[in-house]
Every structure is written in C-alpha cells, then in structure tokens.
Amino acid sequence: MPKRQDIQKILVIGSGPIVIGQAAEFDYAGTQACQALKEEGYEVVLVNSNPATIMTDPTVADRVYIEPLQAEFVARIIRKERPDALLATLGGQTGLNLAVELDRLGVLAEYGVELLGTKLTAIEEAEDRDLFRKLMFKLGHGVPESEIVHTVEEAEQFCAKIGLPIIIRPAYTLGGTGGGIAETMDEFIRIVEGGLKASPATQVLLEKSIAGMKEVEFEVMRDATNQAIIVCAMENFDPVGVHTGDSIVFAPTQTLSDRDYQMMRNVSLDIIRVLGIEGGCNIQFALDPVSFTYYVIEVNPRVSRSSALASKATGYPIAKLAAKIAVGYALSELKNPITETSFASFEPALDYVVAKIPRWPFDKFESADRTLGTQMKATGEVMAMGRTMEEALLKAVRSLEIGQADLHMNRFAEMNEADLHRHIIKATDERLFALYAGIERGHTVEQLHEWTSIDRLFLEKLHHIHRIEQDIVKHGLTPERLRHAKRYGFSDQMLARITQQTETAIRQIRNESGLHPVYKMVDTCAAEFASDTPYYYGTYEVENEAVPTTRPSILVLGSGPIRIGQGVEFDYATVHSIQAIREAGYEAIIVNNNPETVSTDFSISDRLYFEPLTTEDVLEVIRNEQPIGVIVQFGGQTAINLAESLEAEGVKILGTSLEDLDRAEDRKQFEAALTQLDIPQPPGKTAVTVTEATAAASELGYPVLVRPSYVLGGRAMEIVYGEQELEHYMKHAVIASPERPVLVDRYLTGMELEVDAICDGTDVVIPGIMEHIERAGIHSGDSIGVYPPQRVPQAIKELIVDYTTRIAKAFRIKGLLNIQFVFADGELYVLEVNPRASRTVPFISKVTGLPVARLATNVILGDTLASYGLTSGVLPEEKLVSVKVPVFSFAKLKEVDPSLGPEMKSTGEVIGTDRTLEKALYKGLIASGMAIPEHGRVLLTVADQDKQEMLDLAKRFTALGFTLLATAGTASVLEEHGLRVQVVGKLGSEQGSMLEWIEKAEVEYVINTMSRDSQVTKDGFIIRRAAAENNVVCLTSLDTAEALLRVIESLSFEASAIQPFDYMKKAVAR
C-alpha cells in the first residue's frame, strides 16, 4: 500500500515531562516519528510540554508548540492548525489518554481529525481491563482469575472469594501507578484505595497473584495489510511480581524452549491482529516454567519503554517504521534502514546478548522503600551487549555508575547470614548483588532458585562468574585466564580487586600482551545481509568490524542513564554537539549506554559505540578510532569525572582544559580565584573530619549549607542548623577525603539567579538571565525558573554580566559554563561555577532562540563568537515570559519526603510561555500536573519562623473566597489578625484531624513548611506524604505558594459591592 495522499497535515502528541514510568524513550520515539513523517512530505505539527527534549527543537517539526498536554490546550492548537490527522501512539500513556479524551469531548469529530495508527477501539480494548479480559477469553488465551472493581466494597467481595495474595492493576495509568501486590488485608485495602484514586476511569483489575512465574515480553509490529512480525522477544531476570521497568531484562530470550517461544510468538501475532493495532505493540506474558501454561498479563497498544529497548537491542527503528505504517505503508514496502537492502517485514535476528539493568533513585532517597513490586520506581536504565550473558551483564553493571565495578558488594560480603537471606528473598534494587554474595558463601543454584523463583540458568551464570573469579584467586592471572575472564566481561577494575592490584597495573599487563576488544556491528540480521551501519559494541573476539575511516574524528562522551540530577537535558546537549561536529566536517563518534535516548539512535552520529562510560571502555574506543580529541562538557558529571583519567593516558580533552575544570571544581582553588577577582562568595570552608566541620560551622555561624565536592544534582547536600545535625551528616551522609572534602558554607537566604554562558577566550555571550521563584536553599533543579527575570534591578543584571565575563576569562573557559548567584541583603554572591553544560541549556536555548550547545561546540572546535555576529554581554530580553516548572514523581516513591531543599528531587520539567508571568505560571503549573482550583479549602501548617510571612498569603486566600484550615496554634495567630479559620485537629486527634481532611481529599491545597522540632518534623512528613498519595497539592515553600496565589488571582474576577451614593451627603453638608 502506498502512503496516503488524502492527508497533508499531521498533529503529533508528545509525552510531556520525564516521570518515573515515562522517561526519555518517548523523546527518542517522537523525534524518530516526526522525522519519518517529514521525510514523506507531510506537514508536521508537534505539541509537547517538555523543553528538555530534542523532540521540541524547532527543526524536528514544521511547527512546535511547547504547551500543556491538556485537552483544553491541544483543542486550541487543533482549532488553530486544523490538522487532517492525529498521531498519539508515540506519546506514551499521556498521548493515549489525551487522544481518548479529545475523542470523548467531540473535538476530533468537530474538526474532522482522524486518529492515525491504532484506532480508539483497539486502545480501549487493550487499556480497559474489563474489555481486555473479555477479549482474551474470547480468543482462548489464558488470563489470571480476575475481576474489575470500581469500589473498595467490590474489591473486598472478590478478595473473600479467592483469597490473598492479589495483584492490583489500575486502568489507564503509567508504570503501574497505584498498583501493587497485597499479602495482607490492610495492604489490600490501602492499595485498592490508592489504585482507584490513580485510575482516570476509577477502575482497577484485581487478579489472583501469579508472582513467581517467568515473565516474557514480545515487541510486535503490524501494518494495515495484516502483515505482522516479532521485532524482539525479551526475558526478565526477575519473575512476575516485579514491574518490567524495574526488572533486569535479557534479549533474545535465554531460557525458553523452542516450543515455548513459538507458542507465545503465535499468541502475540494473534492478539495484535485481532486488536487491529497498526504500528508497534508490547505484549507481556507470564509463563509457568514447568508446564506450557501461559497467561497474557497486558498489552500496550503503543510505543513503550520496551520498544526503545528493543529498537536499540536489535537496531530495528520501531518508532520510525510505526509512523510510516500509520500513513499507509506496508512492512514489505519499507526498507530496513540498517541494511538498506532487506525489508522491514524480515524479523530481526541477534548474534549477541543484550542486558538491560534499571537505574533507581535510591542513592538520592535513602529513606525510600527499596522493595520492587508492580509499581515502577526506576528513573532510567542502561543497556550492554556482549557475546555471552555474563559479558553483557557485567558490562551493564559497570554502566550503572553506582560505585560497583562488578557483582561483589562489600556490604553484603560483611553481612550476617540472616540479614543476607532477607536481602536475597526480597526483590530490591540490590538483590543481584545479594545473590552474588550468597554464591560467594557457598549457596547452591538450587537453594537460590527455591528462595527467589529466579530461573536456574540466570543463577548458573552468576555462579560461572564466581568460578572464573575463584580460579584467578587460586591460580593467578595468567595470559590464558586474563583472556578467558575478558571474554566473560571482567573489567580491569574487577580484575584489580580480585588480584589486589591497581586498575592501571592490569591495563599495563593487558597492553603488554596485546589484549584488546574488537568491535562488532549491530545489523538486525546476524550478518545474513550486508550492512555498513556504524553501530558497535565491544567484545573479546578476533575480527574487528569497526574499521576507522581516514577522516578526522571527534569523540563525544554521553551522560549515561537518566537519574535525578542528570536527566535528558544532558542528552539534548550531547545531540546538539554531535550535530555541530558533523556540520563542521568532522566525523562524530559517541560513546553512551542509555537505550532510551536520541543520542544512541544510530542515525544521529557517524559512529555509535554502545559501551559503559568507564575509563577502560572509553580508552579502548579511543585506541580503535584515534580521534583528534574528546569533548566532555555535555555528558554531565559522568563525562567530567572521566576527564582526569583520560588525560592521564594521553587523551586530548577539547574545550576547557582539565586544569581549569579542576580550578572550578576544587573548593580551595575556586575560592582563591574569586578572591583574586574581588567577587563576593558566601563565606565557606572545607572539612575532612567531623572536628574540622564543627569548627568551620562555629566560625561561620549556623545555619550552614554542607555538601560533598564533585557532585551533580545536590547529592547529599543539606542545610544544617546545629552541631548534632552536622556530626550526623559527616558520619552518615558522606565519605570525606583530602581529595574530596566536604564544603561548609554560610547559608544565605535570598533571590537565586542563574546564567549559562559561552566563552571563546575573548568574548562571553550570555543568552539570558534566569530568576528562581524560590529563594536560595532549594536546589536550582527543583525551583521554578523565570526568563526574563521579573524582579531583578538593572544594576544587578549588569553586575551578573560583569561577574560572568570576568569568571569565564579567569577560568579560561572554552565552551560552556553555568553560574549560580544569590542576591541577599543588597549584595550579589557567586554560589557556584560549573564549567560544563547544565540542565538549563535546553530551556534557555528554546526561550531565547540561541542554540547554546551547538554554538559552544563550534567554539570548542575553534570558531569565534564574533564570527556568528555575537559580542560580549547578555542578549536582548524576549517579550514573552517563560517559566520552567519542575515535575516530581513522589506518588511512586513511598517514604520519600516531598519537601524541597538543597538536594534535587525532581525527575523532569515543563515549560509555560505567555505574555505575562501569571499566564506563563498557569500554563507551567497545569503542564506539571498540578490542579489549580480557584476556590475551596487551604490547610496551613507552617513552622514558627514562617508564621508572619504566612499571614499575607492567608489574607489573599481569604480575599479569593478560600476557607482557611489550621491547627489551634496557627489558627490563633490568624485569628489575632482578624482572619476566620476552621480549627482542625493535630495528627492523632480522635476526630477531625488534618490527616482525615487530606485523605478524603477535602482540601484543595496544603501549605506546609519544615520545622526543626523533631516531633513536628515527623508530623510534617506524614502530612506531606498523605498529600502526595491523595493527589492534593502540597507546597513546602512560601515562595511557590505566593506564585500559585498570583496565578489564582489572575484567573479570578473581582467581586466588589458597589459604593454607596455620596453626592446626597455632600449636598446635606453644603
């Protein structure tokens, strides 16, 4: 079937901000889809709310709207643009839910907009739990015994009938939001209540637990002619019961018999055909390992996280081909872009093993419940490829950047047997390491299988790694054993641990024996067809397929897995850098290990190496490619942290020199440089011991801001109010050393400001100054950022330009730098300087129209800013106001405190742009998922130091018609100032406690600020968690509350009584 000629303009819906369950994979899918549609000559209009993505670049679509993904806003775009068709299946769950809502509201019918690809009936049959179950029965496919319920009472009746454990799956949610496995009645009621609240349809599926069965996923494609293929079959290391996004996954499947595989393949093809899905689809199965019984767990009728993994694992570009199928093409008409000779109707074949390991945020949230279940908790993932399962797994482990070079974790090695047993049987982010510790202690594969239900083959592979390790311990590292260990993925660092040598010593042994990896091509066809797509992975074999070209090349280091503090913003900068390198005539090489991102799309760079971002792995790529230099500025802290070890091995770092990177990162050198420049900075000191830290704090005066050096995202950063707190921080939160001391600064409260700047050694260009709504003390990544600044005097703007220019030149910056300031007590202070791309680069690029990362790359390559018509200073301010609003995933992470502070907690961001600050804020807050009721109840529970400031906010809420709720202490303060308050009970009150109000969602807003009193702090945590779990807006900063008030005031009409006539009084007076 040829492409459709009856449509010209297509609206593509993106997936919005990065949240747990919906990450960068949709930036990759959406970008591919837009490019595919433009290739075919269609006019493409894109709507998405996320400024941090390549997808929202102006070049990706013909017109890009960065607007809230709400029916109200998308309907406006449809009215304005009048598209012929809508493509929603590349926008994740957000895109699907929005398409369903637009259809329900009649918007699509009113404007004659056709839904491309998968039809609404198929979406509803796959997403609606009841319809899906009925379809599976009709087709004769197994589904677990289950029932759809809409109330807790219905749920209790089903539980009484089949008994516990029960799996709870809410309908139309993302990443298992609101779901879980209930082992007890209390758990069951709690999860059902949460699931009903989380589901837009107030519908949950209760099913008899099949936890412990083998979990398998099939990625399937179908076109309108009913051709269908399996792109990739993947097998989870963890049995059913752990969300697939939280599971270690292998591709191709490793433990299935051919009969099992063919059975589920046929079922997958049957399901996609009956549903009539046109494009990509993900089907999840539970398989009984001892019989041929299977159950269909769920069908995702869209491109998903697994699609991105399958695309990168096989090289088959699912999203691109799904977009082409949506406009009428058949699989047999589409060429496979990797081979360019075979067609997309050929099923991919793999001659290597792929391992995916999730990246969890528990290093940021140590209080979080680390148990893994049906509700996803990972923020990102890594992927690795090898010729053996062991190699792929070990490469993936060292890609995680969690301080683990291999499977041996000291904490588990030193643990007592009972505690280790608990860590083995319980699914957590660390169970893989606990299993290895069990093997080190002599537990058999059979024992571990009995305890965990993990397939024996997977456990045998862990056992094999341990046997290789023990062989080296007993017999030494001979050349044969070295080669054997390398073939199974042992890194130099791992071998250094085993042999008690240094990593450098192992590298030297390897270099002397000429032992290096070769690079194999990912070609979708196991070398059946000729392919020259430069997409490689390293392995220890004989033939090297990555033959370097003669053109001069530059290597860019990616930023690794998505995590809090280092998100998709860094991938955005990396992609722009690669594009600039290619445009400058160099060959662009990238090393990265994240399957979700645009940077690991093989069509972006000239050569893609899917490898761990470690010194060893990067050096081997450099040895093979011999680039003229390496760029580390765009890969976040991951890349910056590799600069020193690479330069020590003779690698040329392009851009800002290592010496100058160190001067900015090293506290003493940084302070000395600012003192020499006569630029104010908060008084501060460094400390290596508890004594040094307490002495520094006493001298500076409490409160102090403490943090480790060389970190990103405010990792382990805290505001400390007393000596006891500081001692606890030094003993538990950080490991200080002379090379990496703890920084102790006086804590300044004031307005925080931020700039990104580009320096070529002569000129310093600042695209724009960003102002933070929240005062200093809340991490910049968690603050609402405003451009252009609204409250900053002209004299301070000029001072920011002056300080930035002088710092950039003094630190000999070549490329990008980011500076954070605080304006406190009439003085402008420099808080920190980052000599690299920051997370605000995509935002400032989009709101100013200056491609910051691309321009910085051109400067690194030798261009001057003057050659682009740019001179030193800040660009003229834009007329529209833009706000960057952080997005959090607190509902997914139980036990995490939703209060904001100096350690970053947001997973993503959205943008709001309009003519006034209030309108921009409204769009930004709505886009972030916040509901903004214009009347109702506000619960005020604030710390004593905030009560005076709270009064003004309380008066303004009252003027808008809100009812104020407060506990007795806060209520008395409000009543003293003439405000009417409804008194509510404290936590633990027998009736009418504030917790009841929140749990029943009978308040619209909770304003809660942190107290230093330990009991009050504990109560505050319970209040904030209750708000997060019941979808009640909770604000922990009065600055954010004031911004919200401005928005509500701008939406509200004044309701004033008319004035009495006074001319009669005047006449009488005369």
UniProtKB/Swiss-Prot annotation:
It catalyses: hydrogencarbonate + L-glutamine + 2 ATP + H2O = carbamoyl phosphate + L-glutamate + 2 ADP + phosphate + 2 H(+). Residues 402-546 are annotated as: Oligomerization domain. ATP 1 binds at residues 129, 169, 175-176, 208, 210, 215, 241-243, 284, 298. GO terms for biological process: 'de novo' UMP biosynthetic process; glutamine metabolic process; L-arginine biosynthetic process. Binds 4 Mg(2+) or Mn(2+) ions per subunit. GO terms for molecular function: ATP binding; carbamoyl-phosphate synthase (ammonia) activity; carbamoyl-phosphate synthase (glutamine-hydrolyzing) activity; metal ion binding. This is Carbamoyl phosphate synthase large chain. It comes from Exiguobacterium sibiricum (strain DSM 17290 / CCUG 55495 / CIP 109462 / JCM 13490 / 255-15). The gene is carB.
